[in-house]
């Protein structure tokens, strides 16, 4: 992991890991941590160093948004316009602008969340999101199918990467902030980086396997 290319940032997935494990990674220089449970992330935010950049990487429920808006650096999993609008509403109340990634469904499993490419195109073309002044769409996120088939993983990541280029050219050509492509986890981040990822979400390779 120390060999990461310059443009790739590491999100250390610290969910279910104790503060001590995060502090150890922090002392080693890691500053970006990813959590998928609102309550857990908020508790950690309150008790850990304030220069940590907290990324929310789970499935976000609309009624929980208000708890993370004051401090979250990036929300990776925006999978509906409704969710985006609610983040905007809560961010406006908090006097903040929240960075968000649109989550695309690229895997074969039905269990994964996200827009289809067509749904995402429709939402962006409709243009209502331009009225939301308290969110900033900074890029896209996706999860590949959990499989040992490297070719399939590569194909899924490449499809998201080319969709990113399409979206950037069509709707965010002048937006410098639209530059993040969050894809790749412990088992497939090499393929993700090769396909153009700028954010990899890695847990077990840093913290070891979790004890549930």
Task: Explain the meaning of each model-derived region.
Residues 1-187, 193-195, 207-209:
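Conserved alpha/beta-domain cores
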Residues 198-199:
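Divalent-metal-activated hydrolytic enzyme cores
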Residues 202-212:
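Short C-terminal tail/terminal secondary-structure segment
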């Amino acid at each position: 992991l120390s060999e990461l290319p310059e443009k790739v940032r590491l999100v250390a997935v610290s969910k279910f890991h104790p503060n001590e494990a995060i502090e150890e990674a922090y002392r080693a220089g890691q500053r970006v941590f990813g959590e998928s449970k609102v309550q857990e992330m908020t508790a950690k935010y309150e008790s850990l160093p304030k220069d940590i950049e907290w990324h929310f990487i789970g499935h976000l429920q609309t009624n929980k948004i208000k708890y993370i808006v004051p401090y979250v650096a990036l929300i990776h999993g925006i999978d509906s316009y409704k969710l985006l609008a609610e983040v905007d509403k809560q961010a406006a109340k908090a006097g903040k602008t929240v960075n968000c990634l649109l989550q695309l469904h690229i895997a074969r499993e039905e269990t994964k969340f996200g827009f289809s490419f067509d749904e995402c195109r429709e939402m962006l073309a409709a243009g209502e999101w331009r009225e939301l002044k308290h969110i900033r769409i900074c890029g896209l996120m996706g999860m590949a199918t959990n499989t040992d088939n490297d070719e399939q993983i590569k194909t899924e990541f490449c499809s998201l990467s080319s969709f990113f280029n399409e979206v950037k050219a069509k709707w965010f050509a002048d937006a410098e902030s639209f530059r993040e492509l969050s894809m790749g986890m412990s088992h497939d981040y090499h393929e993700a980086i090769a396909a153009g990822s700028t954010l990899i979400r890695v847990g077990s390779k840093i913290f070891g396997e979790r004890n549930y």
